[in-house]
């Protein structure tokens, strides 16, 4: 999905993300079992590493990183990571972790798919679990993706009901399947809630260029958009400045502009990370597609809390969203997976 090479920075203070250094795993000394004693050998922490092509503030890698920090606290893993790794350096970093005794390596392979798969094949005893547009490969390369089209659809319902100009927009990264399906799901919901809406779509050609995303959002607002899907960082800032409404993406970003951000689809990588870590710990790891762990029914995605908007959203809008969410969770309704180029009216 991602081939980011943009080094634009945004204020790291905006994101509640600690840059604390990862502690080295505290390995308990193995206790030799005396003949007939039954003493157990203390287990060493599972060594896990992540390799990210972008800064960890970027939404996609941020969510993976947050889940791995959670695994460090809850599952006791020894976690290290490398961020903003250029494509040309990806192979070296992967090899460094694999040769250093890392048992599970995660991250996004979109910037270096061929290299990541090649290195995985050369270290068959190391589990590789990467965001990828391809499938798993035996014996050790597993994949996942951000299947958050379901909450994106729910956000579209809200946008369709809340627009006053009958014009909604989306500023997104690139016209690739993983992005297109989110924008199309958003539009599906918006059209269902309001058949009269027009749609404005802009791709900025980067996964991390907040100034460019803001510029694109301002152009859409000037064209009449009054509810915008902020698929990339930078859009919410424009929406706040111009007094329109925004839908965030990947994480709960309400704190950036509480009066602007109604909600947004949240990608929770915890179910995926938990499943992968437990498999490796149990010695039961096999090459798999972990994609299903990102669906709402698995807890891998959900609608961000309304926060202050809970009191401001009309009751009929909240009921519409709640009813549709229930049908998604019970399996009686499926959101379309449309990876074609999103429309722009």
Model regions: which residues?
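Periplasmic-binding protein-like
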Residues: 102-109, 129-131, 223-233, 249
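Short beta-strand elements at the ligand-binding edges of bilobed clamshell
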Residues: 136-158, 170-175, 258-271
